[in-house]
């Protein structure tokens, strides 16, 4: 089954000291392919660098080549949809990266989001399904 990853999921997977690491690793091993929007990659690199050091960023970048992760660029269609999502949910303070995950999931017709951010993704009503399945 294919899924789409948000930042917190990846950070917890890479950082073995993270309180969600074991649970996230188990979910990761159950996935066939995990789409990673480029916007998520930038946020992951920033957070890993700040919290776990540059060696963790390097580890993640090397892991991308041999892992279940597939890096995907945002399209013009995604950018337009991100703008719509940010406008519709501006009172909820959904951020650009979360909106990019939502938009890409809709475009790819994916319903499983790997995230630790249950608040934003639970609020959102996607166009491609009733609600996203959030793991873990």
Predicted regions and their residues:
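Alpha-helix/helix-capping structural signal
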Residues: 8-9, 39, 77, 119
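Short active-site oxyanion
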Residues: 1, 31-34, 68-70, 107-112
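Short, well-structured N-terminal submotif of metal-dependent ribonuclease cores
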Residues: 1-36, 49-62, 127-128
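Amphipathic alpha-helical segments within well-ordered protein domains
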Residues: 8, 42-45, 83
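Active-site neighborhoods of divalent-metal-dependent phosphate/nucleic-acid chemistry enzymes
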Residues: 71-116
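Histidine- and aromatic-rich ligand-binding microenvironments
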Residues: 2-6, 36-37, 94-95, 117, ...
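Acidic, PIN/NYN-like endoribonuclease modules and their adjacent C-terminal/linker elements
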Residues: 108-136
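Helix-adjacent hinge/juxtasegments
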Residues: 55-75
């Amino acid at each position: 089954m294919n899924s789409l990853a948000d930042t917190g999921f990846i950070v917890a997977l890479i950082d073995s000291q993270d309180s969600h690491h074991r649970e996230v690793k188990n979910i990761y091993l159950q996935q066939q392919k995990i789409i990673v929007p480029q916007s998520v990659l930038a946020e992951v690199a920033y957070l890993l660098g700040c919290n776990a050091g540059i060696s963790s960023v390097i580890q993640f970048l090397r892991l991308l080549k041999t892992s279940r992760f597939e890096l995907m660029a945002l399209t013009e269609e995604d950018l337009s949809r991100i703008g719509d999502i940010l406008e519709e949910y501006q009172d909820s303070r959904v951020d650009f990266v979360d909106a990019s995950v939502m938009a890409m999931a809709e475009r790819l017709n994916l319903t499983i989001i790997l995230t630790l951010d249950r608040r934003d993704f639970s609020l959102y009503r996607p166009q491609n399904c009733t609600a996203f399945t959030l793991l873990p």
